[in-house]
Amino acid sequence: MIKQRTLKRIVQATGVGLHTGKKVTLTLRPAPANTGVIYRRTDLNPPVDFPADAKSVRDTMLCTCLVNEHDVRISTVEHLNAALAGLGIDNIVIEVNAPEIPIMDGSAAPFVYLLLDAGIDELNCAKKFVRIKETVRVEDGDKWAEFKPYNGFSLDFTIDFNHPAIDSSNQRYAMNFSADAFMRQISRARTFGFMRDIEYLQSRGLCLGGSFDCAIVVDDYRVLNEDGLRFEDEFVRHKMLDAIGDLFMCGHNIIGAFIAYKSGHALNNKLLQAVLAKQEAWEYVTFQDDAELPLTFKAPSAVLA
């Protein structure tokens, strides 16, 4: 049986909030089977829980937020959510003593290291996947994203940025997803932004944690970070990282093919909601026999060591 996963032990880290620029303490806790992914703000009294849910997602200019029925929000969840998807973590409680998850280095890699440090435990309960049965597509002007049936999880993402720092040959990235491929090829890709936007936001008291330490920063011509890029195509790899996190907001790894053109958080979420709203387009599946599981989701030894 393919089993649900949680953490072996509690781990903690500190980082800076993208919005406030203040120190944030992040605590990751194991959770029982069928808990799902729960984000929790402990700076509120009593603490407020935000279960990962496609319907709770709001896309703001700076990040992805989860918002509850009282309009309370937790911000900057997308990169940690991508790390959970990458390692197939089904059950976890994520606590922060702030309104936001720390931005760390702007990628998912610090969260991957933290999760691996906690260790990953299998629970004696079948892991539920969402399997795509019919093609579903959403559009917004010339942007689009779609899911097709496929026995695995593949992603094919194209961006179209007209910028000298982004070579036209580095605007598409495609991969067959696996925990190993996610860790090596995607998790280290950082978010990016324009220097002028960061300066403008900071002049208005926003994005106070934004810096060269947590993003690729560009002007109109070039990358301004001293160390340059981690990958030649880091921009499109990061957009794929975002998509992996966005699509895991249903709380389950997805079996299907994802293809997108110029998509972002809002359109990724619109696609996920469109799939879930169309009952005949998907189904929950479990795997009693390991041999039936798509190769994509076989855990590498590093994950379950």
Swiss-Prot record:
Disulphide bond pairs? none
Which keywords appear in this protein's UniProt record, sorted alphabetically?
Hydrolase, Lipid A biosynthesis, Lipid biosynthesis, Lipid metabolism, Metal-binding, Zinc
Q: Which InterPro entries does the record cross-reference, listed alphabetically?
A: Ribosomal_Su5_D2-typ_SF, UDP-acyl_GlcNac_deAcase, UDP-acyl_GlcNac_deAcase_C, UDP-acyl_N-AcGlcN_deAcase_N
Q: Which Pfam families match?
A: LpxC
A biological process term (GO) from this entry:
lipid A biosynthetic process
Q: In which pathway does it act?
A: Glycolipid biosynthesis; lipid IV(A) biosynthesis; lipid IV(A) from (3R)-3-hydroxytetradecanoyl-[acyl-carrier-protein] and UDP-N-acetyl-alpha-D-glucosamine: step 2/6
Question: What is catalyzed by this enzyme?
Answer: a UDP-3-O-[(3R)-3-hydroxyacyl]-N-acetyl-alpha-D-glucosamine + H2O = a UDP-3-O-[(3R)-3-hydroxyacyl]-alpha-D-glucosamine + acetate
Please give one Gene Ontology molecular function term for this protein: metal ion binding
Q: Where is it found, in Gene Ontology cellular component terms?
A: membrane
Required cofactor names:
Zn(2+)
Q: What class of enzyme is it?
A: hydrolase
- Per UniProt, Zn(2+) binds at 79, 238, 242
- The annotated active site, in chain numbering, is 265 (proton donor)
Q: What is its EC number?
A: 3.5.1.108
The protein's role, per its UniProt record: Catalyzes the hydrolysis of UDP-3-O-myristoyl-N-acetylglucosamine to form UDP-3-O-myristoylglucosamine and acetate, the committed step in lipid A biosynthesis.
Can you tell me which family this protein belongs to? Belongs to the LpxC family.
- For this entry, the protein name equals UDP-3-O-acyl-N-acetylglucosamine deacetylase
What organism, scientifically named, is this protein from?
Shigella boydii serotype 4 (strain Sb227)
